[in-house]
Amino acid sequence: MVRNKSVFVVLLFSLFLSFGLLCSAKDFPGRRSEDDPQQRYEDCRKRCQLETRGQTEQDKCEDRSETQLKEEQQRDGEDPQRRYQDCRQHCQQEERRLRPHCEQSCREQYEKQQQQQPDKQFKECQQRCQWQEQRPERKQQCVKECREQYQEDPWKGERENKWREEEEEESDEGEQQQRNNPYYFHRRSFQERFREEHGNFRVLQRFADKHHLLRGINEFRIAILEANPNTFVLPHHCDAEKIYVVTNGRGTVTFVTHENKESYNVVPGVVVRIPAGSTVYLANQDNREKLTIAVLHRPVNNPGQFQKFFPAGQENPQSYLRIFSREILEAVFNTRSEQLDELPGGRQSHRRQQGQGMFRKASQEQIRALSQGATSPRGKGSEGYAFNLLSQTPRYSNQNGRFYEACPRNFQQQLREVDSSVVAFEINKGSIFVPHYNSKATFVVLVTEGNGHVEMVCPHLSRQSSDWSSREEEEQEEQEVERRSGQYKRVRAQLSTGNLFVVPAGHPVTFVASQNEDLGLLGFGLYNGQDNKRIFVAGKTNNVRQWDRQAKELAFGVESRLVDEVFNNNPQESYFVSGRDRRGFDERRGSNNPLSPFLDFARLF
């Protein structure tokens, strides 16, 4: 009898061992299980049911199968972005001649994984619903949640494609030149504070962290808020005065001050001032377009540092109400402890919360209700906190472009507290916003659409430097600039959507649209309460035309009529000019031509 039991135990152990090997097999030719852990799990469960005796042995077999499935899904669920970075790091160990091919393979593998990831995750989630849930209504709800999680975020692939495009668009040499430019910020210079399924909030690095030349504007911060279609942004307040400028989409901005509530329907061009301490929340009304808002912050506590405070939240962001002691909350709200658990962040709320984060998906009915009663800002108005910049009459305009501007002296309630103007300008393809400089304001210019480039004259970078942003050489650089006063360097940067460029006061600058598409830009004129003036050095209204004849001759060393021939040569066009044929220009420019020195100057632009 004992012998028979021993034989039975040996046979049973061998049977379990064979099933373990079958369930862990990966390399059988022609099997799709290699790419589908879920299918391997289902096959293994079937074998457990068919070939094991007794419910206990079958349960153990299925438990082993489920454990192996979870381990494989955990490996497969690793972040593709992280695997891509690991692959690129591995390429750095290869020989230099093999690195490009290695990195190309990494990109191809990454793209393949990204294309497969959402569908694969949805199918696996759907299959889990089938065998985990017994009741039909629970299965239906489970599948719905899978679909919402993996199939209703079409912008996920768009975001990841944009990351890949950004990595490939510039050569190593071009990236080095842009990094050495203290006035240029690539869109990757924005640091993510909140990046979620339904939106993101990115803040530009502090200006002085890029270079000490920008320390004069270091108290300001620039940020970008993006909300996906039918998305709600949680209520919050900030320890900073803010200006919202809508650059894309349409939505509703609502904020509550200590006195009343303001609510505005917003479209591109709408400017909204959010007073410090006001609780604000937003909703994207559109079913397809993202709502994108550029935000200027002027902190009230610490220059260049601001924080958001959320009364309703769970983990990230956390509700600041939950930080107070329970005794305080029970007293001030006159409520029981059980009811406090129903508040956001409470024990009971965790089970009911539809999602976490700053951005929440909302139904179309909820979005419509949030927009009821909101007003649509108009072009001008001394009352209210919002206006539409693009509904104004352009400050400068012709067939080559348009320039809109709102200054604190005309929009006191909206702009005075932040001490900034807001400008938006559109340059038609192949056209130029003529060289000019600002008397007092420093402009921070963000590219909202299109491509082009900017050229600026800078006295601070006249000396070639391998590291312009080095703080150790700061005093030495400043002393050398003072000794070499009158020496300049041309600062040039390529512009594309999301990039940012800083134009200090007094620095001549020009913006040029590419030959293929228009260039759209948004600018904040910092410290514009000092009554900034814009002085043009080219075009019909250029500054040189008003000089005395003797001043022209003494300055340029030629007769004043020759100076006028250059600076008055374009009497019809002002502010914006089209890119014209250069052949006539080059014919007038010869080695014996007395105009050569300032024809060279003009050609700079």
Swiss-Prot record:
Cupin type-1 domain: from which residue to which, for each copy?
183-341, 387-564
Supply the CDD domains for this chain: cupin_7S_vicilin-like_C (cd02245), cupin_7S_vicilin-like_N (cd02244)
> Among its keywords, does the record have Signal?
yes
One GO term in the molecular function aspect is:
nutrient reservoir activity
Region forming the signal peptide: 1-23
What spans are recorded as compositionally biased (Acidic residues)? 166-175
Q: Which UniProt keywords apply?
A: Seed storage protein, Signal, Storage protein, Vacuole
- What's a Pfam family this protein contains? Vicilin_N
Give positions of region: Disordered.
52-81, 157-181, 465-485
GO (cellular component) term, any one: vacuole
Q: Where in the cell is it found?
A: Vacuole, Aleurone grain; Vacuole
Primary location recorded for the protein, binned into one broad class: other
Tell me, in a sentence or two, what this protein's role is. Answer: Seed storage protein.
Give the matching PANTHER family.
OS03G0336100 PROTEIN-RELATED (PTHR31189), VICILIN C72 (PTHR31189:SF41)
Q: Which family does it belong to?
A: Belongs to the 7S seed storage protein family.
Instruction: Tell me what this protein is called.
Output: Vicilin GC72-A
The record lists the organism as Gossypium hirsutum (Upland cotton)
